[in-house]
Amino acid sequence: MIKNKIKNLDLSATLKINEISKNLENDGKEVIKFGFGQSPFQVPDQVVEELKKNAHQKSYLPIQGLYELREVIAKYESKKKNKKFTPDQIIVGPGSKELMFLLHISFDGEIILPVPSWVSYQPQSIIADNKFHWIETSANDNWYPTAESIEKLILKDKDKNYLLILNSPNNPSGQVCKNLEEISKIIKKYKIIVLSDEIYSELIFNVNYESIANYCSEKTIVSNGLSKWCGAGGWRLGYFVIPNELNQLKNSMKVLASETFSAVSAPIQFAAISAFEIDHSDYITKSKKILKGIGEYVYHNLKSNNVIMNKPMGGFYLMPEFLNKKFKTSTDMCSDLLNKKSVAILPGFDFGFPKDKMITRLSYTDFDGKNFMSKINLDTSIDEDLINKYAPNIIKGTKRLKDWVEKD
C-alpha cells in the first residue's frame, strides 16, 4: 500500500542522527553530538517576550502569512539586498523546508543539485517526481558549481525548465559561494530559476554577505527563516521572497499551502515580527564570534595529512575528509566512529557524495550557547581556554576524533 518512491526513502539523516544520539544518552552513554545542525543559541529575549504576549492569538491567519510580518520581512530583505521588495512577494511557511517542498511539487521541470547539498533537497525532488541532476564541485571552488558546469548540463536539453538550488553559506561544507555573478549570467541565458537558500546568511564570518538575487532577482526565489541566526528551529517559521516574474509559482504554492498547513501558527507569526523589526546586531555578532572561534579551533586541531577540509566561512559546519580510512562506505565509517569514540557525525553520502568517499559533515554546535554568550563581550577573543570552559564537548570531541584518526 506504500508507493515505491516512498518505500525507498529513509528518515532525514540530520533528524535521525539526533534521535540516535538521544537514545544512546538515554542508555547512559556520553555522546558528542557533532551530527545535528541545530543552533546552540537561545532565541533573543525580546522575541521570546513577544511570543508570551501573543500566546492568546488563536485565529487562522492569511495563507500567505500575517501582513505585518510580511511587511517587516520585506523591509529586512530590501535593506539586506539594497533592492525593493514588497509584502506581496513574501510567503510565510512552517519552516522554509515546507515551502521548499511545496516549490518542488509546484515546479514543472528538473532540479540541479550541487554536490554537496543539504540532505532534504534530493528526497523532496523524489517525492515530487522531479528528475534531479547532481553537479560535481571541488574544494578549490569552495564546493560550489562553476558557471561552465551548470551550462554544460543545461545544454544537454536547453528547452527544459530547470531549478538550481544554491545554499550559501553552505550546509554541509561551511563555505560561501564566490562566483554568484558568473552563475547569474548562465541563469539569465536559459530556462532556469534559482532557489537561493540563505538560512545561514546572517552567520557569515569574514566576508560581506552577497545573494544571487543581487544579480538576477527576477529569476531568484530567496529562502530564509528563524531557525539558524535566531536560534528558533523548533518554532518552525520560514519564508520565501518570490519575484513578481514568478507569480504563477507563488500562487500555486499558496494553493498547496491552503490544502496542507493552512497557515503558520498565529502566536509564532506575531512574535516573529520582533525578530525582523528589532535590532539584534549584538546577538548576531556574539553568535558569529563564538561560532567562528569554535569552528577555527576544530579546523586547526583536526586538520592533518590524514584529514583535509576547508576552513569554515560561515554557519556551523566543517566537512572533513578522512584520507586514511578505508571503509566500504562513509556510513560505515561514521558508525565505527560512533561505536568506538561516541562521536556522532554524518556521512558525506547523505549530502550527495559517492558512498565510498570518506567525507563527512561535522556540526560544531554541541555546547550551551546561551551560557557561552552571556560570558563574553563584543570584543572578547574566543580562545581555547574559553572554549574549554564553556564548550567542553567541542574540545573533548575533537580530541576523540584525532585519537580515532591516529590510532584506528
Model-identified regions with their sequence ranges:
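Conserved PLP-anchoring active-site segment centered on the Schiff-base-forming lysine
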Residues: 106-125
